[in-house]
């Protein structure tokens, strides 16, 4: 579960390494986010020469959580880290590569570009 002030790793090559959650979008009183939720965050660590810089306010979609996710078939999936992919306003990723596995639930939320760039979909 992702909440305000959570720090997430960035799973793409947009130039950001770590982001801090400012707000979870969707409704007026959403307190926690899970895989597939859009968040507003600020860049806390960045690589030199990247698309985004430290201090930039960005939108991102959560792709991995330590908390995990229950699926309809009864299975349960959880990851070793909390990670997100930076996106534009039209839900397309800012980076050109995605690192690490991505949950299959992103397919239901129309993130097909992220799914196609991911090396592994679980």
Curated annotation (Swiss-Prot):
One of its GO terms (biological process) is translation. Pfam families: Ribosomal_L14 (PF00238). Keywords: Ribonucleoprotein, Ribosomal protein, RNA-binding, rRNA-binding. InterPro entries: Ribosomal_uL14, Ribosomal_uL14_bac-type, Ribosomal_uL14_CS, Ribosomal_uL14_sf. GO terms for cellular component: cytosolic large ribosomal subunit. The keyword RNA-binding applies. One of its GO terms (molecular function) is large ribosomal subunit rRNA binding. PANTHER family: 50S/60S RIBOSOMAL PROTEIN L14/L23, LARGE RIBOSOMAL SUBUNIT PROTEIN UL14M. Binds to 23S rRNA. Forms part of two intersubunit bridges in the 70S ribosome. Part of the 50S ribosomal subunit. Forms a cluster with proteins L3 and L19. In the 70S ribosome, L14 and L19 interact and together make contacts with the 16S rRNA in bridges B5 and B8. Belongs to the universal ribosomal protein uL14 family. HAMAP family: Ribosomal_uL14 (MF_01367). This is Large ribosomal subunit protein uL14. The lineage of its organism: Bacteria, Bacillati, Bacillota, Bacilli, Lactobacillales.
């Amino acid at each position: 579960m992702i909440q305000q002030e959570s720090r997430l790793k960035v799973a793409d090559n947009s130039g950001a390494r770590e982001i801090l959650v400012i707000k979870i979008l969707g409704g007026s009183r959403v307190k926690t986010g899970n895989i597939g939720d859009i968040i507003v965050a600020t860049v806390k660590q960045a690589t030199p020469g990247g698309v985004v810089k430290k201090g930039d306010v960005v939108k991102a979609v959560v792709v991995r959580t330590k908390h995990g996710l229950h699926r309809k078939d009864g299975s349960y999936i959880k990851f070793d880290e909390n990670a997100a992919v930076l996106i534009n306003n039209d839900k397309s990723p800012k980076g050109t590569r995605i690192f690490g596995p991505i949950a299959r639930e992103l397919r239901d939320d129309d993130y097909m570009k992220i799914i196609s760039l991911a090396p592994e979909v679980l």
